[in-house]
From Swiss-Prot:
GO terms for molecular function: molybdate ion binding; tungstate binding. InterPro entries: ABC_trnspt_W-bd_WtpA (IPR022498), ModA/WtpA (IPR050682). GO terms for biological process: molybdate ion transport. Belongs to the bacterial solute-binding protein 1 family. WtpA subfamily. CDD domains: PBP2_ModA_WtpA (cd13540). The keyword Ion transport does not apply. This is Uncharacterized solute-binding protein Pmob_0379.
Length: 321
């Protein structure tokens, strides 16, 4: 009987503590995030607000570079930044706007199409570039200066030239993709694809899975997924705009890693901490996995000693609970 009372008391203490913690997290939590995180973050938002009913998560999707520039260039306030490439945070935010980040997810490049795309029954991982270069085929990618998927598309093309041993393949692919086929973020391309204005788009595998669209898988040597081919990925690069006007940053090919951070001037620091803990914790990881986006488990903190102590402690022991 005593053990039953003891168990009941412990359960009460746990539930009371959880309720009190939820009551402490309130208010708006503004999240600027990559377009490719839109579907999983919408589900995370719903689950998070259910756990913390006093909160209101306000999300804005954009290309990761554009999302960061809302803070660095436009002076807007955000509580959380979710980037499709950790180097965007490194290159554009550190050290002025944040000093740390957490790597939490991976992805890979694919070529997405529809049932109405030209030559959909012919295209495969060996001949995709030949199909795309046919005169009646339209293909697109996102803007490299606004979105990591854009410069990753360019890096894939450069790697393809080496992998398939086709002279001038990068130039041919670039020359045959007019400006009208380029959009600010990768998810903007989906509307053009569904409208039949584009036959193929370069996009993340998770986005193709979330929209239940057919896609061509690319060889691991060029899809920017595998650490096994990191050295080969690094043989290709693409220049994008930097922090200052006229400055350029060289993006080196590497396996894809998504990252989270909190800007130094976040209005709702406690809400931001709670949201990041939720994303990198078991519930958030499960939602990411369900949406075709592999999680990094355990998540990897970079310069984490400069992050809020609660996040440091969570990474040390709580992220896998």
């Amino acid at each position: 009987m005593k053990s039953i009372y003891k168990y009941t008391f412990m359960l009460f203490v746990f539930l009371f503590g959880t309720l009190m913690m939820a009551e402490d997290i309130t208010g708006e939590i503004v999240v600027f995030h990559a377009g490719s995180l839109s579907v999983p973050f919408a589900q995370i938002e719903k689950a998070f607000e259910s756990q913390y009913p006093g909160t209101d998560v306000i999300r804005e999707a954009a290309g990761s570079r554009e999302a960061v520039r809302k803070v660095t260039d436009l002076g807007r306030e955000a509580d959380v930044i979710g980037s499709a490439d950790y180097t965007v945070i490194e290159n554009l935010m550190i050290p002025e706007y944040t000093e740390w980040y957490i790597n939490f997810a991976n992805n890979e490049m694919v070529i997405m199409y529809t049932e109405d795309s030209r030559y959909k029954d012919e295209i495969n991982s060996d001949n995709w570039y030949e199909i795309l270069l046919r005169p009646d085929v339209e293909y697109g990618h996102s803007d490299p200066n606004a979105d990591p998927c854009g410069y990753r598309s360019q890096i894939v093309w450069k790697l393809a030239e080496k992998y398939y041993k086709v002279d001038s393949l990068y130039k041919k692919l670039a020359d045959n993709c007019p400006p009208k086929n380029v959009r600010p973020k990768e998810t903007d391309l989906i509307a053009l694809l569904e409208a039949g204005e584009l036959d193929y788009i370069f996009i993340y595998k998770s986005v193709a899975l979330q929209h239940r669209m057919p896609y061509v898988e690319l060889p691991e040597q060029i899809n920017l997924k595998s650490t096994k081919y990191a050295d080969f990925y690094a043989t290709a690069s693409f220049d994008v705009t930097g922090k200052e006007p006229g400055e350029m940053i060289t993006q080196i090919g590497q396996p894809m890693v998504y990252a989270l951070t909190i800007p130094n001037n976040a209005p709702n620091l406690q809400g931001a901490i709670a949201f990041i803990k939720f994303v990198i914790g078991p519930q958030g990881r499960a939602i990411m996995e369900e949406n075709g986006q592999p999680s990094i488990n355990p998540p990897e903190g970079v310069n984490i000693e400069k992050a809020p102590q609660e996040l440091q402690d969570f990474l040390k022991g709580g992220a896998n609970d």
